Swiss-Prot record:
It is found in: Cytoplasm. The modification (3S)-3-hydroxyhistidine is found at H216. InterPro entries: NA-bd_OB-fold, Rib_uL2_dom2, Ribosomal_uL2, Ribosomal_uL2_arc_euk, Ribosomal_uL2_C, Ribosomal_uL2_CS, Ribosomal_uL2_dom3, Ribosomal_uL2_RNA-bd_dom. Component of the large ribosomal subunit. Interacts with CRY1. This is Large ribosomal subunit protein uL2. It comes from the Eukaryota. Gene3D superfamilies: 2.30.30.30, Nucleic acid-binding proteins (2.40.50.140), Ribosomal protein L2, domain 3 (4.10.950.10). The lineage of its organism: Eukaryota, Metazoa, Chordata, Craniata, Vertebrata. Component of the large ribosomal subunit. The ribosome is a large ribonucleoprotein complex responsible for the synthesis of proteins in the cell. GO terms for molecular function: rRNA binding; structural constituent of ribosome. Keywords: Cytoplasm, Hydroxylation, Isopeptide bond, Ribonucleoprotein, Ribosomal protein, RNA-binding, rRNA-binding, Ubl conjugation. PROSITE patterns: RIBOSOMAL_L2.
Length: 257
């Protein structure tokens, strides 16, 4: 009988513990309040910091609490072009400037945004990786919905009340520089999670992987596998619609709703 393979060991098990060592905290927008719904609130960028395990830099933005005599520090994902000492405005009536936070319904079509809310008040879920951005495509005032194009290229209809940061996430072009040596990859993934180095299945023994074994490295069976396969066999191309090269050209007509 074979061993428990890598895919099974990584599956459901004990309670997940988040990797928090040296992390600076959760990067998200302000909790929506009366000031943001009806006007705007002003903050100042105090510092731009690096967060281990994250490609994009973070901005420490200090706001005055609208209800108590104190200051509150928020961690925003930094938009490209912001700087320390810059004023950041959050709210319905804020101006359309880089780094400001506005509802997407108030932005003109074609605006580039990042750290976009998927549902009103979730404080930013989409387009958060370094260099990523979403584009506002169109508005529907009757249904109060806005259509946006996500970094993947897919289009999504969201509420016009969802907030977003104006601009592109800083740190773009990070993956253009080659890693070049294993030592850099080691330190990169050590800060993220235990996923490196990744041994190929064909390089393993037969007890450790369905693709292991043989007098030379070959899979020896179809690499496609059905969706309901048992966990110890479910490796390779799982429930794929097609395999092989994409040959020829195909014209895709996009239907604009």
């Amino acid at each position: 009988m074979g061993r428990v393979i890598r895919g099974q060991r990584k599956g459901a098990g004990s309670v997940f513990r988040a990797h928090v060592k040296h992390r600076k905290g959760a990067a998200r927008l302000r909790a929506v309040d009366f000031a943001e719904r009806h006007g705007y609130i002003k903050g100042i960028v105090k510092d731009i910091i690096h967060d281990p395990g994250r490609g994009a830099p973070l901005a420490k933005v200090v706001f005055r609490d609208p209800y108590r005599f104190k200051k509150r520090t928020e961690l925003f994902i930094a938009a490209e072009g912001i700087h320390t000492g810059q004023f950041v405005y959050c709210g319905k009536k804020a101006q359309l400037n880089i780094g400001n936070v506005l509802p997407v319904g108030t932005m003109p079509e074609g605006t580039i945004v990042c750290c976009l809310e998927e549902k009103p008040g979730d404080r930013g879920k989409l387009a958060r990786a370094s260099g990523n951005y979403a584009t506002v495509i169109s508005h529907n005032p009757e249904t109060k919905k806005t259509r946006v194009k996500l970094p993947s290229g897919s289009k999504k209809v969201i509420s016009s009340a969802n907030r977003a940061v104006v601009g592109v996430v800083a740190g773009g072009g990070r993956i253009d520089k080659p890693i070049l040596k294993a030592g850099r990859a080691y330190h990169k993934y050590k800060a993220k999670r235990n996923c490196w180095p990744r041994v190929r299945g064909v390089a393993m023994n037969p007890v450790e992987h369905p693709f292991g074994g043989g007098n030379h490295q070959h899979i020896g069976k179809p690499s496609t596998i059905r969706r309901d396969a048992p966990a110890g066999r479910k490796v390779g191309l799982i429930a794929v619609r097609r395999t092989g090269r994409l040959r020829g050209t195909k014209t895709v007509q996009e239907k604009e709703n």
